[in-house]
Amino acid sequence: MGSRPASWYEELEPPPALAEFVDRLWAQGIGDADGEGEAIYDQPVLPDGALDVVAVDDHVILAGPATRTTTVELAPGALTVGVRFRPGAAPGLVGASAADLRDLDVPLADLWGPDGAVIAERTVEATGWQARLQALVRGLIDRLGDARAPDPVGVGIAPLLADQPGRPLTAIAEDVGLSERQLRRRVEDAVGLPPRTLARILRFQRFLRAARAAGPGRHLARLAADAGYADQAHLTRESRDLTGLPPAALLTWEDNRLQR
């Protein structure tokens, strides 16, 4: 196998037509397209507060917002592409409440009927990750005529919670002119998660971004404090709850297996 990576991963900016709804496009491959590489690649999928349209092999699904880490087994040569929605923006284009999609993987044909089946067919028939992404993007652009604008409260809550993770929800609700109950309902419909669950996930993702940037010599206690955790023990509890692993073990796994 030589120096062939176990996994490669690419991210791209969305086209301007989808920028109101989509955060990024992404692709991941396992080994080489000829099937060389590890027998099975166990890919953890961590909660990130987002919904994705994902195409892997001959399946195209909408992956709802996750509250827990799951593991996907990818075969040698597997090619996965996806479109990640901005937190809170998906319902306007998807046509369903994000709360109804929580922790679910829904085939596109089940979600959008014949239109979804056509998008899925064109995507899986495309050759190469760029062509697959283009087919998926074209399918989403074709749906823009029936889309509604994202709920500004739903879209605005993620950056607000990320910047002020400890702020009382009542204060945030007052800022946007809603009762706390109304805010919870709007956020769950748009994002698919209760506000405090979303805040926990965003804080953990903030820690992960900083830890990945720091590399193997990272100082976990300092990174935990910078991300808003009370101490390293607090970070460890949250990491175990969200991923099943302590942070050091999770990051060591990434250091050893992923090329970013």
Each PLM stretch: what is its role?
Residues 1-180, 190-195, 209-230, 246-260:
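Alpha-helical bundle regulatory/interaction domains
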Residues 243:
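Short glycine-biased active-site loop of nucleotidyltransferases that positions the nucleotide triphosphate
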